[in-house]
């Protein structure tokens, strides 16, 4: 009998470490799924988190914000960060860029959560992949209407339906805010934060671990579910 394991992946669409973690988890899942006899069906469910909840919708310069808020206005430290992230990104097929705008991500989370509930894991996965790529590799605004509609289109969502949802800024907003509060209540104060549901126990992974560590965790869930 196949055991259904939900992987709760808490993220913010402006967090580069969650982008790396998702790529690595995707690779690990692909390895595990190569064995068609695996007695566990893994499904990823995304949960919202905000790195910068006080950000405006208009946003501010991404490079300047990182340099000031994370690296003490040091160009040297910022250069080291960009080199490190570029190196990590290249390994996972991500072409990190550091320009663009950092802004409030509530509209992006609203899109993810609404269509995750309505369209399922494949749809939400496509939305998240698009939002990450647009923000980190194409320097797009993280929650502009154009960005959200592009993500919806790439996920196969009807254009009229997507536009209607995106433009109704209140639909699903309180639900997303409640989910964010729930995550805080669960003690989550950094992302990525990943919980792999198991038959005997859950496995929690914090941070952007390597592919091998994700594989090891998934294999443990499989072993304990057999």
Which sequence ranges carry the predicted segments?
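A generic fold-level signal
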Residues: 2, 39, 106, 188-189
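C-terminal cap of thioredoxin/glutaredoxin-like
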Residues: 7-10, 14, 22-34, 113-226
């Amino acid at each position: 009998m196949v055991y259904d394991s939900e992987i709760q992946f808490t993220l913010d669409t402006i967090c580069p470490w969650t982008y790396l973690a998702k790529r690595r988890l995707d690779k690990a899942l692909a390895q595990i799924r190569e064995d068609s006899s695996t007695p566990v069906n893994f499904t990823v469910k995304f949960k919202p988190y905000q790195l910068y909840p006080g950000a405006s919708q208009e946003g501010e310069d991404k490079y300047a914000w990182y340099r000031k808020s994370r690296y003490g206005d040091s160009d040297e430290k910022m250069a080291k960060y960009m080199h490190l992230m570029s190196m990590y990104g290249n390994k996972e097929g991500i072409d990190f860029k550091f320009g663009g705008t950092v802004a409030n991500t509530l509209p992006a989370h609203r899109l993810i959560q609404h269509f995750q509930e309505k369209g399922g894991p494949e749809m939400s996965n496509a939305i998240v992949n698009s939002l990450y790529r647009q923000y980190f590799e194409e320097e797009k605004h993280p929650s502009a209407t154009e960005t959200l509609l592009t993500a919806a289109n790439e996920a196969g969502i009807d254009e009229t339906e997507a536009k209607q949802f995106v433009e109704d800024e209140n639909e699903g907003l309180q639900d997303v805010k409640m989910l964010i509060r729930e995550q805080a209540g669960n003690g989550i104060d950094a992302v990525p934060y990943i919980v792999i549901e198991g038959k005997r126990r859950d496995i929690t992974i914090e941070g952007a671990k390597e592919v091998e560590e994700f594989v090891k965790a998934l294999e443990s869930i499989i072993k304990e579910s057999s």
